[in-house]
Design a protein with these regions (language model features):
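Catalytic helix-loop patch of NAD(P)-dependent Rossmann-fold dehydrogenases
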Residues: 88, 92-96, 116-158, 162-163
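Short mixed-charge
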Residues: 24-36
C-alpha cells in the first residue's frame, strides 16, 4: 500500500508521519496494513492542492492507494479575514484531490472539523447531527466535505475537534507555555469537545 499525506509540515500531517514511522499511536497500535505502507508526505511547496494541474501531476506520478488530506487553512480568524483563500484551500483543494483520486482509483481521507456544526448546545456532538456552520472556516470545510462526496466514490471524512500534539500552536501547547509564565490562568469552561 502507498499513502500520500498532504499538509505534511502541519500539526496533523507531522503527527501522522510519526505514528506511521513508529507504528504506535496514543490510542493503540497501528494496523499491520499501515505498518508496511510506503508513505509519501508532501507540503504546499511540493503540492499546492488548489492547483488542479499540479494535483494531477503529483498523484499520477506517485500512484498512491490512499490520499490523506491534512492540508488546510485552519486559522479560524484568518479564514474570516481572507474568505477567498479559505475557500480555495478548504473547499477547492479537497475537490481537486477527490477528482484526481477518482480518476486513478485511490481512496481519499478528508480531514474536516467540528466547526461544520453550529457550536451551540450542552451535549457532545454526533456525526449525524445537522451541519450548520457559522464561520467562514466551518463553511469552507463543509464545502470541502461536500466536494469529496460529490467527486470521489471511495472516501472517508474525519471530523476532528481540539487537535493537539507535539508540534504546532494548540490549546495544550498554549496552556503549558502560559503556565510557565503566569501564576494563574483563566480559561473558558463551557466548551464541549
Amino acid at each position: 500500500m502507498k499513502i500520500l499525506i498532504t499538509g505534511s509540515h502541519g500539526q496533523l500531517g507531522t503527527e501522522l508521519q510519526r505514528i506511521i514511522a513508529t507504528w504506535v499511536a496514543e490510542i493503540g497500535k497501528v494496523s499491520d496494513n499501515i505498518k508496511n505502507a510506503e508513505v509519501v508526505a508532501v507540503d504546499v511547496d511540493k503540492l499546492d492542492i488548489t492547483n488542479l494541474e499540479q494535483v494531477k501531476e503529483v498523484l499520477n506520478k506517485e500512484k498512491q492507494d490512499v490520499v490523506i488530506n491534512c492540508a488546510a487553512a485552519t486559522n479560524v480568524d484568518g479564514c474570516e479575514a481572507n474568505k477567498d483563500f479559505a475557500f480555495k484551500v478548504n473547499a477547492l483543494g479537497p475537490r481537486n484531490l477527490a477528482m484526481v483520486c477518482e480518476e486513478i482509483g485511490a481512496k481519499i481521507v478528508q480531514v474536516s472539523t467540528d466547526y461544520v456544526f453550529r457550536g451551540v448546545g450542552d451535549a457532545p456532538l454526533n456525526e449525524t447531527d445537522i451541519v450548520a456552520p457559522v464561520s467562514s472556516y466551518g463553511k469552507t470545510k463543509l464545502w470541502g466535505e461536500n466536494f469529496v462526496r460529490e467527486f470521489a466514490s471511495k472516501y472517508y471524512i474525519v471530523r476532528t475537534a481540539w487537535l493537539y500534539g507535539y508540534k504546532g500552536h494548540n490549546f495544550v501547547y498554549t496552556m503549558m507555555k502560559l503556565g510557565k509564565d503566569k501564576e494563574s490562568l483563566s480559561v473558558v469552561n463551557d466548551q464541549l469537545g
